[in-house]
Amino acid sequence: MSEAAHLVQYIVVPYRAAAEGVAPGEIRPASSEFGAIRIANSMASKFAGVAAYEVLVDKETGDMQSPRILAQIGTVPALDD
């Protein structure tokens, strides 16, 4: 698939405490890298952990790939390789 078939997006994922560690909450979109980091910082006190990511989104399927961590606050699970 070509790069043109992908779109860069910024997302923030809050994580709540769960019996097995942490569980992801609702993904929040951001308009920029700076915005994602700002949102993550503002949410940090309300969750066990928060992470801001830059991801490539397949325009056809909506699948997210190649996450890059922009900010990680509190307890956040490791990205799968």
Tell where the protein language model's regions lie, with residue ranges.
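Intrinsically disordered, low-complexity boundary segments flanking structured domains
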Residues: 1-2, 14, 37-41, 56-59
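Short aromatic-glycine-(Arg/Gly/Cys) micro-motifs in beta-strand/loop hairpins
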Residues: 2-24
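Ordered hydrophobic segments in well-structured contexts
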Residues: 9-13, 27-29, 49-54
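A broad, structure-centric signal for solvent-exposed, well-ordered loop/edge residues
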Residues: 19, 37, 77-80
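A short, exposed loop/beta-hairpin motif centered on an aromatic-Gly-Thr core
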Residues: 21-33
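A short, charged, amphipathic alpha-helix used as a generic interaction element across diverse proteins
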Residues: 30-49
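Short, mixed-charge low-complexity intrinsically disordered segments
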Residues: 45-81
